[in-house]
């Protein structure tokens, strides 16, 4: 399944990222850890669960080493009045090669806990992540600079409840991580389309169309680089 690698890596990061761990209760954290261990055991790699968790911790530290989000936020606010957002994002987009390495290391570390058929997706997943970063950092971050300048973050904050409702609807429809893993590729693509359409519809209610349009472009870009592009091509 195309999303199993993503699921395993998210579980691993969710277990060990301090910021996430403080946002959920201890029982939920343990459930995530147990699910990760079960996934590893299922594929004869129970002894690798701790390695995956350690890799996730290293990933979090890797990202923190590249980006101080408090500093970035201040730099963005300082740059807005001067129209210098492109300079801020150009500086951080220059770190994209290191970020790609962080991601590749994490996904590679997760492979022992995956079925053999899914391990074949590690390359495409890494390529997809690279393309996503390149999309965001197009022309040294022009896209994200425009997104910020056009009130993108404010739009997302304003519509956070609607976006959360979209995610909750998907969660209720799927049921569980195990149920998500059992979906066929076409079904997974359908769920992705439902979720992204719901999010776009919510963002389109903002005062400016830019955030919704950019989100739609991003979602389509991600989809085009995934197996969904061939398995369940869009009609338009």
Swiss-Prot record:
<protein>
    <recommendedName>
        <fullName>27 kDa hemolymph protein</fullName>
    </recommendedName>
</protein>
<keyword id="KW-0732">Signal</keyword>
<dbReference type="Pfam" id="PF07165">
    <property type="entry name" value="DUF1397"/>
</dbReference>
<comment type="similarity">
    <text>Belongs to the UPF0408 family.</text>
</comment>
<comment type="subunit">
    <text>Monomer.</text>
</comment>
<dbReference type="InterPro" id="IPR009832">
    <property type="entry name" value="DUF1397"/>
</dbReference>
<feature type="signal peptide">
    <location>
        <begin position="1"/>
        <end position="17"/>
    </location>
</feature>
<dbReference type="GO" id="GO:0005576">
    <property type="term" value="C:extracellular region"/>
</dbReference>
<keyword id="KW-0964">Secreted</keyword>
């Amino acid at each position: 399944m195309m999303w199993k690698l993503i699921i395993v890596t998210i579980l691993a990061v969710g277990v060990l990222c301090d910021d996430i761990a403080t946002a959920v209760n201890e029982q939920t954290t343990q459930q995530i850890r147990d699910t990760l261990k079960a996934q590893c055991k299922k594929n004869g790699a129970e002894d690798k669960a701790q390695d995956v968790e350690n890799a996730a911790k290293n990933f979090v530290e890797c990202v923190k080493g590249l980006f101080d989000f408090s500093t970035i936020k201040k730099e963005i606010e300082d740059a807005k009045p001067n129209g210098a957002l492109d300079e801020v994002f150009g500086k951080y987009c220059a770190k994209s090669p290191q970020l790609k390495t962080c991601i590749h290391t994490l996904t590679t570390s997760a492979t022992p806990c995956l079925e053999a058929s899914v391990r074949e997706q590690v390359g495409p997943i890494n390529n997809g992540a690279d393309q996503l970063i390149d999309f965001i950092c197009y022309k040294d971050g022009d896209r994200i600079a425009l997104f910020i300048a056009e009130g993108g973050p404010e739009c997302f904050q304003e519509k956070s409840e609607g976006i959360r409702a979209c995610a909750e609807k998907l969660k209720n429809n799927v049921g569980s991580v195990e149920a998500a893993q059992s979906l066929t590729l076409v079904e997974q693509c359908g769920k992705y389309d439902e979720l992204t359409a719901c999010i776009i519809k919510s963002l389109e209610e903002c005062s400016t169309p830019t955030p919704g349009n950019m989100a739609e472009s991003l979602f389509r870009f991600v989809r085009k680089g995934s197996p969904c592009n061939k398995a369940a091509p869009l009609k338009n």
